[in-house]
Amino acid sequence: MSRLTTAFAAVLLALSVITPVFAATTGLVRGTITVDGKPAAGATVLLEGQGSLFKATTNSQGVYVFSLVPFGSYRVIARANGAHELQVIVNVISGHVSTVDVALSTQLKQIAQTTVTAHAGAEANPASVNTLTRTDIQTSPVNNSLNRLLETLPGVVQFSYNEPVINGFHGVTYNIDGAPLPLATTSNFAEIIDPKLINSLEVLTGAIPAEYGGDRMGGVVNIISNRPTDIPQGTYGSITGGFGNQAQGIGSFDVESRTGLSEFFLSANMQTTDRGLDAPTYTPINDAASNNDQFFRFITQLTPRSTLAFDYSNQFSQFQIPINTDPNNPLDPIVSAPGTLDTQLEYERFSNLNWTQVSQDGNGVFQLIPWWRSTRIDYYGDLPLDVLAVEPDFSVCPPTCDKTIHVVGLNQGSYASYIGLRGSDFRATKNHAWKVGFDVSRENATAYQEFACYYVNCAASGPVATPFFPAYTTPQGQAGSQIGIYAEDRWQETPNILWSYGLRYDASTGYVSGNQISPRIGVNLWDGGKNVAHIYYGRFYAAPLLEDVRQACVLLSAQQACSTTNPVYDLKPESDAYLEMGDVYTFNPRFTLGINIFEKSVVNVLDTTQLFNTPIFAVYNNSIGINHGAELRLQEQEPGGDQWFLTTTYSGSYAACISGSEFLFPPNTNQPGVSCVAQLSLEDHSQTVDSTAAYTHRFGGGPQLWYATLQGNYGSGFPVQFEDANINLNGTLPAHTTLDFSLGRNLTPGKSGEDQGLGLSLQVLNLLNHQYVIKVANGFNTTQIANGRNFLLRLTAPF
């Protein structure tokens, strides 16, 4: 046996993932270091990767523990006096514990260095859990959009206005740096966080543990803003400026500082464009947008076993609402008066404080996270001109679509504030690890809505109001609460079998109250070789956020004001049952294939329709919904630094009947005498095939700071008719393929004194300028056309 083979055999790996862990974005790494078979007391263990460096010293039994490790790929480096150094590559998974035992030897001194890669075995991530590292994000052509980044992953479909649809239905649960970040459906065009602030992210489209719940659960997105970094003491930063076509302009200021055991990160960004939202015309009319945001993060080591972190974010965004003024536009039957200018202003703030206490042996963690968020949305309609717009009367279309009506103008505003507390306690033993925790929050929301009609009293005909008739104004004010309590465990029955199980209780109050007990159970089965099979079943409960609730009324078809006597607010909580089965095949440690088959059934689907001729969503309940499909991800990290991936999702989502918030529905969708099952029809956001593939080439000498990425995107097209809103339309829109490209040079944080030169990023989206139709107006949606070729060039100077 060769010495190199002996060195590989000397590394004893028992990577045993034991439980969902303390924070939503971290895992635990532990193990034992031995020298010639004996525990190595005082050995040095380094954990290096993702720009971070952690250091530990083994105890008298040779045991080491890294208790708070953000997800990603790392090297465990073991060193002991007189022994040969060994390195083990390990993938740290959010919510898991990885045990890496390393056996050193004094007989291998002639070998300069040995590096091996650990096979995760039964602890491997299911195919429905995927991550994007800082490198993935930096090299992506779509890294200027969080939603577009998510849409490169399996199970995620790109819908209108870049909304990510996961597992067939609306709704994504976000966590940032371990704290929840609730997001309503109805109003926001801006993304929940500027992607320039993101270090890495993890997406769970399935295998969702019991610690997550209470909100819409199409998927869970865990975001790390800034990691503890391996930089020298001092202050470092960069300034970025950029420009592009479509009047794009961008500027960023980033600074990070390390003093003693503390670090802080500060980022300020601004961006403008003349092409903000998907427009109903190929050349947008009134489509300017801008965004300004600031983000601050502070991390400090209070004691050797406790840490404190603080986040604060402020964001302001403005959007013009694009219109169509051409009555002969074959794609958009909604025709606005020239000069109509509606706008929306969005104000977002959030903060959280994260206190973590690690047990003396490192295998237990207690965490407490108070958090706060506020959101204000103001939609300013150009009411005198809004009421001059006309559209087909979808309530009688068919048999005829020739009859036109004047649309209803809209002014609305909403404000919501949240305050909450998240707590958890985790403990790992040899074969078990358990976690118990809670999430409690309180929301206060206020809102107003003003409608404007063309005719007096909002009649279908008669005297014309000048400049418009104010149809309805309804102030809303409501408080609500959510509480979630859970307990979960992961049991390593054998090296080949890993059980995950938990129970969660959710209760919510507001306009409508509800509660549910949700079991979750899954098992990983490792064949001892390259396959890890996975089966999972879970129940989910999703309470609607208060700003998503509107008074139930049918306004569009009657063009009459809603009743002011006993207004009904009846948007109901959603209840899901989800089943998945999948397999991860490891060709080699850097090359994997994941396949997942899933089925979801839903009661009281929290679904959306667009409000009048605006891009704003109104939320309602479909009585039932189903989704089924399969997802695939093939990815490889080549030894030379190049990497590539292929993601494909094949799915179909269906819904029927209306059970809550009957708002703006022209037809009677609940057909008498016909079961809802018999009425199931494709959701408007159901795209049968959605696929993305990309290849990244790294170059530029030793550090390989340069990269070039080519990405292809394919979609089979969305349905043009849903819920019988317009059965004159049928089928799906044509399939579409686009190409994106990026070229750039990265800068290394904290290396400004060494890294001479500028950072560069060139992104060209829709390289072939293929402007395809995303949606057509059908009573549920407005017409939206994809953006054409656009480029953005950014230069970054370090200091």
Please place each PLM-identified region on the residue numbering.
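Gram-negative outer-membrane beta-barrel transporters
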Residues: 494, 498, 597-601, 618-721
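Short acidic/polar hinge/loop motifs at secondary-structure boundaries
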Residues: 139, 179-207, 296
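Extracytoplasmic beta-strand/coil segments of soluble accessory domains associated
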Residues: 145-182, 199
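Short, acidic, small-residue-rich periplasmic hinge/interaction motif at the N-terminus
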Residues: 34-38, 44-50, 79-83, 93-139, ...
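Transmembrane beta-barrel wall of Gram-negative outer-membrane proteins
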Residues: 243-272, 282-322, 343-363, 428-431, ...
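Membrane-embedded beta-barrel scaffold of Gram-negative outer-membrane proteins
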Residues: 365-383, 526, 570-621, 625-628, ...
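A beta-strand signature from Gram-negative outer-membrane beta-barrel systems
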Residues: 152-153, 193-238
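C-terminal beta-signal and adjacent terminal beta-strands/loops
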Residues: 702, 713-721, 745-799
